């Protein structure tokens, strides 16, 4: 059966739910799909909680990661929504997942207020460049005391302001559970939330005019069709039958041709910046490509092993290191979708770097990574984020 073609009429926006575990991120995601399905039945499918909660597992370096993608539409926009699980072990996914957001819904339980993971997710959203955060104050049906809710709202606004997010962002009181149960008052609250999402998350500035680049997130084989490489197009446009290069991690550059582009299992003539797509690549075996590489327009991006970066090292309170590090520190540098070990050289006159410090460092990676100036990275130790930074200068 031929696949349905995907019509590109409305603005396409990538969003996600972030926040503390058990504050109701997944329940809210389910409630949004149900409420929008009931509001615009011809535009939306409803997704049950357990469909979203049983997110497909991705195993990444020994950690099982779950991430769920759903799509839905309001009158104004088409949304792709990632539900990022809340455990500290899954910060990795926050980094891969949150990097895919044009805006985020921060879910905070009105019964609890901001918790450690709430702060961690907001900090991470800042690090990975999420442009906008608005707030769903969930479980609002369980708090009768108006003053208590106002207090929680104030705390959340302070938290956003502390990371340079919009302090005046919408804070919408919702009850995801009651909305799922069809309680009219709370169904309306979710409609209000989505109206706020439509209004407050800016139309993404799509980077369609830049040369094509897509970080590889996954690679698999489709019997009879060949190898498919999936990821979110970071910039530019890819058309069927265009030549590309696969760059980074390995010593040689692989050249190939894209013979098909698909999104949400629908065929497209092209994929463009911001789209989560699968690219069918000609003459490439599954083992020829791996996560951490990038697919690019030929000749536009080169892999590098040495760079200078400006970094922030998390304080102990933010879940970072408890002790300073010195010259020749060897953490992992997390670029786009993968970790690469690197050796750090501190600036002259700097003996050590304390948790909570900002500093400039020079780094020598053990594998090449496709990079440009301005590229963001996380610094990690055994899967735990201990710092964040951006490339300021490429050396080699």
Curated annotation (Swiss-Prot):
Residues 10-205 form the tr-type G domain. Residues 19-26 are annotated as: G1. Keywords: Cytoplasm, Elongation factor, GTP-binding, Hydrolase, Magnesium, Metal-binding, Nucleotide-binding, Protein biosynthesis. Residues 175-177 are annotated as: G5. It is found in: Cytoplasm. Mg(2+) binds at residue 26. Gene3D superfamilies: P-loop containing nucleotide triphosphate hydrolases (3.40.50.300), Translation factors (2.40.30.10). Residues 62-66 are annotated as: G2. Residues 83-86 are annotated as: G3. GO terms for molecular function: GTP binding; GTPase activity; translation elongation factor activity. InterPro entries: EF-Tu_GTP-bd (IPR041709), EF-Tu_GTPase (IPR050055), EFTu-like_2 (IPR004161), EFTU_2 (IPR033720), G_TR_CS (IPR031157), P-loop_NTPase (IPR027417), Small_GTP-bd (IPR005225), T_Tr_GTP-bd_dom (IPR000795). GTP hydrolase that promotes the GTP-dependent binding of aminoacyl-tRNA to the A-site of ribosomes during protein biosynthesis. Monomer. This is Elongation factor Tu. The gene is tuf.
